[in-house]
């Protein structure tokens, strides 16, 4: 933990950076550091973080993931309410935004809170690249995140209930691709989705390069074998592979995993009620996101809660404005220290 703290202090050489060390674990007595910038963090945020961490007493804190579960308010939500990172520059940028960073002994992962959905689709490289390149990459991530859990359900809804909205050549192509397949389309999609999830989990457990190989080559081999055996149609294999590719474009593994879970709920609702069920599932997910909060801040900021952001946080959302326009810190920082760029903000 001292090394991790030193990595942050090397990048943020300010006397206003404070590190509060506490002990966690009734028997393990693990060291936990709470870092924040004194004049940027809002009053009460550090105390709220400590209160959440002290809400339960356990024997041992083996990793920062244990602290993360105790610090989350809505444990039943599939979406992560805290941001994690292994990069010191990401932690420093979060501190300069008025957020709190929590480090745990024997863990390379830092916990950042509060956080919003927008933070899970941003990367540190977005601020190191030019505006056009960063905005294009970020736009692709947003589209990929949406498609990663909606494509299979939309396919089932359209092909089972609403084929009239498709062009006739496309309908015939779908029909010819399914000739000889003994299973309904729902079973086909579930079989391939579960196979890809199994390959992904197996790739994590296997060592090194072998794990990456089994995830890619294994998917191709199983998909081709399933098509040759007339178990699934080629359209379903392409659809599932493209959906998996979209999930890989999401920077945060925890955030991508939430979409992987919700994907099956959307599939079942779409197969049951068609396009109506597809829309119901999207509305339920949207309502849940709208109600979710992280340390009191709306999870969907800056898309909701514009009265809190003043319209400035929207400049660093789907499109990243030039750095000279990002003169204001996010809403997490104190109002009197909101300005982070000296110069003409209208330049």
What are the residue ranges of the model-derived segments?
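Cytosolic regulatory modules rich in charged/polar residues
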Residues: 1-185, 294-322, 331-347
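Positions that flank functional sites
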Residues: 27, 110, 214, 241, ...
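Transmembrane alpha-helix detector for multi-pass membrane proteins
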Residues: 144-163, 175-253, 258-259, 264-270, ...
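Hydrophobic alpha-helical transmembrane segments of membrane transport and translocation systems
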Residues: 234-236, 240-347
């Amino acid at each position: 933990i001292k090394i991790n703290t030193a990595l942050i202090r090397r990048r943020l050489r300010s006397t206003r950076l404070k590190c509060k060390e506490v002990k966690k674990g009734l028997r393990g007595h693990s060291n936990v550091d709470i870092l924040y910038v004194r004049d940027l963090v809002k009053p009460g945020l550090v105390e709220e973080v400590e209160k959440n961490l002290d809400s339960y007493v356990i024997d041992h804190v083996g990793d920062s993931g244990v602290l993360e579960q105790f610090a989350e308010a809505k444990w039943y939500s599939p979406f992560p309410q805290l941001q994690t990172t292994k990069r010191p520059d990401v932690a420093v940028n979060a501190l300069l935004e008025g957020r709190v960073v929590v480090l745990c002994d024997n863990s390379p992962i830092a916990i950042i809170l509060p956080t919003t959905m927008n933070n899970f689709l941003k990367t540190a490289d977005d601020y190191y690249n030019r505006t056009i390149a960063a905005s294009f990459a970020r736009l692709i991530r947003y589209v990929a995140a949406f498609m990663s859990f909606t494509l299979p359900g939309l396919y089932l809804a359209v092909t089972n209930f609403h084929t009239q909205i498709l062009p006739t050549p496309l309908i015939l192509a779908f029909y010819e691709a399914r000739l000889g397949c003994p299973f309904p389309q729902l079973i086909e999609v579930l079989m391939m989705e579960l196979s890809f999830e199994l390959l992904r989990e197996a790739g994590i457990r296997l060592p090194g390069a072998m794990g990456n190989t089994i995830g890619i080559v294994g998917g191709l081999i199983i998909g081709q074998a399933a098509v040759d055996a007339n178990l699934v149609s080629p359209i379903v294999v392409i659809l599932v592979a493209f959906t998996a590719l979209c999930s890989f474009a999401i920077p945060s593994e925890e955030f991508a995993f939430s979409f992987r879970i919700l994907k099956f709920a959307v599939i079942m609702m779409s197969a049951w009620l068609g396009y109506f069920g597809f829309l119901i599932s999207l509305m339920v997910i949207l309502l849940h996101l709208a109600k979710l909060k992280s340390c009191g801040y709306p999870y969907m900021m800056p898309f909701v809660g514009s009265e809190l952001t003043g319209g400035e946080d929207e400049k660093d959302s789907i499109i990243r404005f030039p750095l000279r326009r990002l003169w204001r810190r996010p809403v997490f920082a104190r109002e009197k220290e909101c300005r982070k760029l000296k110069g003409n903000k209208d330049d």
